[in-house]
């Protein structure tokens, strides 16, 4: 007999006053949608990124207002980085990959000693499958820097821990890297190094 709980992880970014929260949420959703849909071959310039956004609008994959919420400079900086180049040249990249896995309760809660499983569902922003393991990447659109960014990393660690467990369960392969990329700050944080 086992007890099942469902946790659904979403990564909306909330910060600031109510109006700012609404704008931050919209920016986060639109940016994630854009990163999940864009053609990696269209990431070489601001102009090509804007054209790609317009193409996705024409295909009704993005709302007509979406491009005004995308910071194309930040997206270009990401795809010009070593990680961006690695993603563009990878053999297998999964984007916006949904997951639904059962995870042992004792892996999620320190004080639990049982065989109960917890159903966890969510969506990976990006999975990079490579010979030496899996890289889990989570994009963040938070407008934070310095000490606030360090605190935000700590806030997101539990989410990435769940993603780590879910990816290993789902793909039956070791997670070699858990990455958070803060688009606004242009900063990559590796929470798990092999």
Language-model region placement:
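Structural signature of nuclease core domains in nucleic-acid processing machines
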Residues: 1-194
